[in-house]
């Protein structure tokens, strides 16, 4: 998982999820697209 100051969708399968005031990007196709804002 990448920790970045700004997260964005990297492909059309990526989803933006808010959990406990943390913005995350999850991808069902490519696990390398996982990101967390921090």
Swiss-Prot record:
Keyword annotations from UniProtKB, A to Z: Ribonucleoprotein, Ribosomal protein
Organism domain of life: Bacteria
Read off the Pfam families from this record: Ribosomal_L36 (PF00444)
- Write the protein's name: Large ribosomal subunit protein bL36
* PANTHER family for this protein: 50S RIBOSOMAL PROTEIN L36, CHLOROPLASTIC, LARGE RIBOSOMAL SUBUNIT PROTEIN BL36C
Q: Name one GO cellular component term.
A: ribosome
Family in the record: Belongs to the bacterial ribosomal protein bL36 family.
Q: Does the keyword Isomerase apply?
A: no
A single GO molecular-function term is: structural constituent of ribosome
One BP annotation, GO: translation
Q: Which organism is it from?
A: Wigglesworthia glossinidia brevipalpis
